[in-house]
């Protein structure tokens, strides 16, 4: 849809980051606002549209952030989480970005790191807010192929908003 129509707002309302004006989001039959955030975020991964970071993270550190919902409040990632993050980066094809500062990555590199961060959470649902924005054609194809593979081969449900109907149709379920 066009700019300013509310695509991002809709996604944020769906996952409880913004309130609905009326109605509610049901998550496994329960109002999402009545659930513990850890219960929600251990099942859903969200890749936001904005990509600026207040802190300097390496690719590996960014991917590790995806395990936060599975750790205690002050618990640091251990050897197991680091190995999971390294394996996820290998799976997504971005091991070369492990030590690169996210603020110095290209749009395509960062998007793949954010996808790896979302996947390490082992979600049942992944929500992508305009994942191809700012990417060149090659990186758009990489991201869209990854979304399609997640949905069709790995059974992860995906909700994606986009300005490009052709991109949406290329990864949509065709049942």
Residue ranges of model-derived segments:
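Conserved ABC ATPase signature
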Residues: 101-105, 109
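Catalytic Walker B motif of ABC-type/P-loop ATPase nucleotide-binding domains
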Residues: 126-130
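H-loop/switch region of ABC-family ATPase nucleotide-binding domains
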Residues: 162-163
